[in-house]
């Protein structure tokens, strides 16, 4: 849209029209930027994620899996102390490798306990998934639930094959 506007302003002969369009565009950009800045200053979009991130880091749970919307954010909130790979869903446990380090998905990358982090909605939707039945529930706050497994292999063995 901006390149088209530049062509319009270049061809427009009436100075008032050029001024009016430029002023209108400037006002729109300033209002949009102001709204975005105010949103960042007044709303903590990660407020609900902080308690579970602190729990994971504070208890030494340093590797696990979660769905895409939570994985990278928790890693960022813990300054990399907690590494989380992406999965598509808790039933099939297929790796969703978008926007995360490939090392998380390499066999043998992590030795030791592995967790599965789910939202309350995911937990309810996949209540019958083997991973939820076989993992040890170590955290629940009404928003997030964490299940613990002895190893990544144990977690991945809970995957249900797609039909």
Each predicted region: which residue ranges?
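Membrane-embedded alpha-helical segments of integral membrane proteins
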Residues: 1-3
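N-terminal secretory signal sequences
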Residues: 16-18, 40, 131-132
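Short, flexible, glycine/charge-rich loop motifs used to bind or transfer phosphoryl groups or to couple energy/partner
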Residues: 54, 73, 103-107
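Short periplasmic/luminal acceptor-recognition loop of GT-C membrane glycosyltransferases, typified by
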Residues: 59-94
